[in-house]
Amino acid sequence: MVVFKSLLLNLCILLSVAFYTLLERKVLSSMQIRKGPNKVGLYGIIQPIADALKLFLKEFFIPVNSNSFMFMILPLLGLTLSLMLWAVFPSMWMFNFHSYLLMLFVALTGTFVYVIIFAGWSSNSKYSFLGGMRAAAQTISYEVSMLLLLFFAVLMYRTYSWYEAGLSSPIGIIIFIIMFIWFASCLAETNRAPFDFAEGESELVSGFNIEYYGGMFALLFLAEYSSILFMCMMSTVWFLYSDMIFIMTLLILLIAMAFLFARGVYPRHRYDLLMNLCWKSFLPFSLCCICYSMLLWIV
């Protein structure tokens, strides 16, 4: 029964990712004053299914002199890690109310960096390798400030439990500043615009996944967008309000739309400014938040 529920959850996640990509294309097309997908099905509603069939039915080639085993297994590993993230979210039918599931989230997010690095290295392409190194450096840098902000919320709520954090009230006025920095860190962590330097077309073509196409590219694509939806859910639980299911769903949709608007509105940032923003602005602020929460514990 648990296996069936897990498979059903994964299927729902993949369907959500499929239609989230359709929503992204519709939003970007509206911002650019064009129609977007509107041919496949009613108003283009089944366009993601057509795209998936096209990708998975393509013939698959392995680059010459590449590490074939790692090249083939890493996209599947990336998708598996992204789907495993959803196991830490408490639900009535998954029986996962363990108090320390947040530690599992920290471990899984740290592991995903290796997928990026080795996917770039195993392709035997200098462009993919440089893209992998750049994406890994960016992910590791922003992961520090993101986890510090997360532990600030843990110290304020005085619990590691997702369920208890969801039932708690927001952390007051300071939550608006923290939410802005958390959202920017999530954009950088998931390699989304304006921080998508792993895919700087003028420099690295498509980053670490330049040699992937067809089904392998689709798996990496699903992993990326699954992580985005999970970050939207996590932001709502730990930094906003999630006691009522309707309000929680509305807030998740608003944050998911913010990811799309950030891509359509802002130009790509400069890489050196991105790193300076992390180490000189976000990290000191995150440390100040931790010190503030520790002072509250002492008082």
Curated annotation (Swiss-Prot):
Mention one GO biological process in which this protein takes part, according to its record. aerobic respiration
According to the record, the segments passing through the membrane are: 2-22, 69-89, 101-121, 136-156, 167-187, 214-234, 242-262, 279-299
Gene Ontology CC annotation, any one: mitochondrial inner membrane
The membrane-topology field of this record reads: Multi-pass membrane protein
- Compartment list: Mitochondrion inner membrane
Query: Can the keyword Nucleotidyltransferase be found in this entry's annotation?
Result: no
* Reaction(s) this enzyme catalyzes, per UniProt: a ubiquinone + NADH + 5 H(+)(in) = a ubiquinol + NAD(+) + 4 H(+)(out)
What is the top-level taxon of the source organism? Eukaryota
Indicate the enzyme's highest-level EC class: translocase
Q: Does the keyword Transport apply?
A: yes
Which keywords, in A-to-Z order, does the entry hold? Electron transport, Membrane, Mitochondrion, Mitochondrion inner membrane, NAD, Respiratory chain, Translocase, Transmembrane, Transmembrane helix, Transport, Ubiquinone
One function term, GO molecular function aspect: NADH dehydrogenase (ubiquinone) activity
EC number(s) of the enzyme?
Answer: 7.1.1.2
One Pfam family, short name please? NADHdh
Family membership noted in the UniProt record = Belongs to the complex I subunit 1 family.
Q: What is its biological role?
A: Core subunit of the mitochondrial membrane respiratory chain NADH dehydrogenase (Complex I) that is believed to belong to the minimal assembly required for catalysis. Complex I functions in the transfer of electrons from NADH to the respiratory chain. The immediate electron acceptor for the enzyme is believed to be ubiquinone.
Record's PANTHER family?
NADH DEHYDROGENASE SUBUNIT 1, NADH-UBIQUINONE OXIDOREDUCTASE CHAIN 1
- The protein's name: NADH-ubiquinone oxidoreductase chain 1
Source species: Albinaria caerulea
State the encoding gene: ND1
